[in-house]
């Protein structure tokens, strides 16, 4: 079984098995006893994410096909640590409104080991080139926990992931050339949480979007988002988090393409009210 579905399956079992045991032994009308950190209406997380990037982009202009540029290998982009903000508003026990913002930025200057065509212009190996990639990743979503227990839950995710990517190359001869891709992307997914200790939880979620093939071969799109993390709650109002995030975006618009991946560990803190 693939690792991601297996992780979510384990979380599902951690939620469902206690409920089955309670039903088997006739537990009825028990008083809710939420785990530490589950009694809140507003949750705010500040995280530091250190992903390993894959950034493959090509851009056509004026009928001139562009080369696929590997911004990591061609320009030596290094792993960078990014700040991430997550906010969850919880008006009711099983319902959450979620927001997330991650500003992503890479920049490097150097000599190319090969000549490339980008946005209709040729960048040769003889001159230094300034390369920049900016990616604003935002998320607006709703979570419905259709199974909710004191020691875990299983829920449905409905999100809009707003992606704003801009890549540019610049040198003294050509000047600055850039390409951008902006779009709100609807995704659906699942989320599950289980408590391994009264104050320690493991949470996993996976959401996706895939444009059906065959509609128009000039337009393609895929979006996959996997997140697995643990939380240690010191009190109901404060905790520490650490986990692994994998974000994959692929798009094709006519002859412009982008294949973007960010995968890596993160850590931070969470406060609740």
Located regions from the model:
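Cleavable N-terminal export/targeting peptides
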Residues: 1-38
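Predominantly the C-terminal beta-signal and adjacent terminal strand-loop region
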Residues: 224, 231-273
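Short glycine/proline- and aromatic-enriched beta-strand/turn motifs that initiate or cap beta-hairpins
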Residues: 23-104, 268, 272
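Extracellular/periplasm-exposed beta-strand and loop segments of Gram-negative cell-envelope proteins
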Residues: 54-80, 103-136, 162-183, 212-219, ...
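Hydrophobic, lipid-facing positions within transmembrane beta-strands of outer-membrane proteins
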Residues: 40-42, 71, 81-85, 136-140, ...
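Residues on the lipid-exposed face of transmembrane beta-strands in outer-membrane beta-barrel proteins
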Residues: 44-46, 85-89, 99, 140-144, ...
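Repeated loop/turn-to-beta-strand initiation elements of outer-membrane beta-barrel proteins
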Residues: 94-97, 150-152, 198-202, 234-240
């Amino acid at each position: 079984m693939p690792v991601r579905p297996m992780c979510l399956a384990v979380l599902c079992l951690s939620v469902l098995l206690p409920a089955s045991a309670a039903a088997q032994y006739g537990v009825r009308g028990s008083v809710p006893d939420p785990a530490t950190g589950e009694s809140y209406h507003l949750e705010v997380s500040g995280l530091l994410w250190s992903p390993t990037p894959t950034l493959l982009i090509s851009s056509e202009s004026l009928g001139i096909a562009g080369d696929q540029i590997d911004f990591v290998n061609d320009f030596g982009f290094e792993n960078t640590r990014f700040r991430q903000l997550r906010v969850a508003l919880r008006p009711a026990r099983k319902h959450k409104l979620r927001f997330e913002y991650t500003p992503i930025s890479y920049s490097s200057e150097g000599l190319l080991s090969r000549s490339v065509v980008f946005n209709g212009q040729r960048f040769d190996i003889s001159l230094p080139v300034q390369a920049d990639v900016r990616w604003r990743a935002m998320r607006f979503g709703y979570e419905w926990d259709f199974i909710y227990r004191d020691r875990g839950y299983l829920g449905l995710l409905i999100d809009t992931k707003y992606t704003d990517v801009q890549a540019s190359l610049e040198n003294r001869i050509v000047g600055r050339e850039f390409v951008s891709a902006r779009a709100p992307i609807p995704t659906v997914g699942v989320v599950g949480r289980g408590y391994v200790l009264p104050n320690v939880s493991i949470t996993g979620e996976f959401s996706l979007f895939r444009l059906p093939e065959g509609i128009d071969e000039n337009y393609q799109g895929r979006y996959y988002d996997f997140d697995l993390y643990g939380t240690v709650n010191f009190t109901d109002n404060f905790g520490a988090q650490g986990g692994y995030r994998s974000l994959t975006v692929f798009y094709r618009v006519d002859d412009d393409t982008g294949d973007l991946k960010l995968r890596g560990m993160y850590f931070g803190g969470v406060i609740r009210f």
